[in-house]
Swiss-Prot record:
This is Cyclin-Y-like protein 1. One of its GO terms (molecular function) is protein kinase binding. GO terms for cellular component: plasma membrane. Belongs to the cyclin family. Cyclin Y subfamily. Key regulator of Wnt signaling implicated in various biological processes such as embryonic neurogenesis. The lineage of its organism: Eukaryota, Metazoa, Chordata, Craniata, Vertebrata. It is found in: Cell membrane.
């Protein structure tokens, strides 16, 4: 998952910039310039972001910033624990499996190969907490389901006042991932793009726009991160009643609001993966554990050897490239003198 894709900002695009960017521009404008008469070239140290700005950075861009969905879920987690403590609710039979000397329980989900079903459950739960604990109802017309319906069925009048249940969000996302044959990594990147959109455009995901925002994030993540490219017309065949023109328009607005920043560093991806696992533990959505058998141990060993061989090959290629860069530096060997 070390691959990163970046894109330049369109000169004609005019997405709404967040407050952090305005403060960053003020900081750069106040940078001292040398009194030399020659042309001034800004040093890389002059472009470093101050600590107070780095701490307020968007979590979808910087690994040190905490994810938004995890902080929004903590309120419900604390209330649930407090209610159980006051009402003396017993946890009942412990369903969590623990390893012992004779048996080791492991799940089949890793940061590089997450479990698809469990990951989609966690991602949709994060979206559920985003909707439930939203600050307001800031939205745009392009994401309004009443103005741009996804089906021919009439949208209820109270659609903007009823929060969707977790099962409804999971069913919607699961249908798209199953039909388009998307991977679990794509689900994590979908959540990254979703939180980046909410931060950059200063929006809230709410009952009136959650389907189109999630669809736009999945559409973009599948094109950037999935090995098999999914076209907009493919989603039109899945949703049946949506038009290609509507999909193209929504994708264009989504990219503009992201300021064409589709880069997801490996550290940010890993942070979202482990925060999703924490969210699963807090909500009793633990990943399925199975005892370690000889067959699974051999499979893990084979995967480890495959990764090890791949990294060895990459290091050899990098070493050969460095030696053959300009034919000036090579490996020098000296004869040993034995006495």
């Amino acid at each position: 998952m070390g691959n990163t894709v970046s894109c330049c900002v369109s000169p004609s695009g005019s997405p709404k910039l967040p407050r952090q960017v305005e403060r960053l521009e003020d900081y750069q404008n106040n940078t001292d310039i040398s009194d030399d008469t020659g042309p001034y070239l800004q040093h890389i140290s002059d472009r470093e972001v101050p600590d107070d700005l780095a701490l307020e950075s968007n979590p979808s861009d910087h690994a040190r910033a905490s994810t938004i969905f995890l902080s929004k879920s903590q309120t419900d987690v604390r209330d649930r624990r407090k209610s159980n403590h006051i009402n003396h609710v017993s946890p009942g039979l412990l369903s969590k499996k623990y390893s012992s000397c004779s048996t080791i329980f492991i799940d089949d989900s890793t940061v590089s190969q997450p479990n698809l079903k469990s990951t989609i459950k966690c991602v949709t739960l994060a979206i559920y907490y985003h909707i439930k604990n939203r600050d307001s109802d800031r939205s745009l017309d392009i994401f309004d389901e009443k103005m741009h319906p996804l089906s021919r069925e009439q949208v209820p009048d109270d659609y903007s006042r009823t929060d969707p249940e977790h099962k409804l969000i999971y069913r919607f996302v699961r249908t798209l991932f199953s039909a388009a044959q998307l991977t679990a990594e794509c689900a994590i990147v979908t959540l990254v793009y979703l939180e980046r959109l909410l931060t950059y455009a200063e929006l809230d995901i709410c009952p009136s726009n959650w389907k189109r925002i999630v669809l736009g994030a999945i559409l973009l993540a599948s094109k950037v991160w999935d090995d098999q490219a999914v076209w907009n017309v493919d989603y039109c065949q899945i949703l049946k009643d949506i038009t290609v023109e509507d999909m193209n328009e929504m994708e264009r607005h989504f990219l503009e609001l992201l300021q064409f920043n589709i880069n997801v560093p490996a550290s940010v991806y890993a942070k979202y993966y482990f925060d999703l696992r924490s969210l699963a533990d807090d909500n009793n959505l633990s990943f399925p554990l199975e005892p370690l058998s000889n067959e699974r141990a051999q499979k893990l060993e084979a995967i480890s050897r495959l990764c090890e061989d791949k990294y060895k090959d990459l290091s050899r290629v990098a070493m050969r490239r460095s030696f053959s860069a300009d034919n000036l530096v090579g490996i020098r060997r000296s004869n040993a003198v034995l006495s």
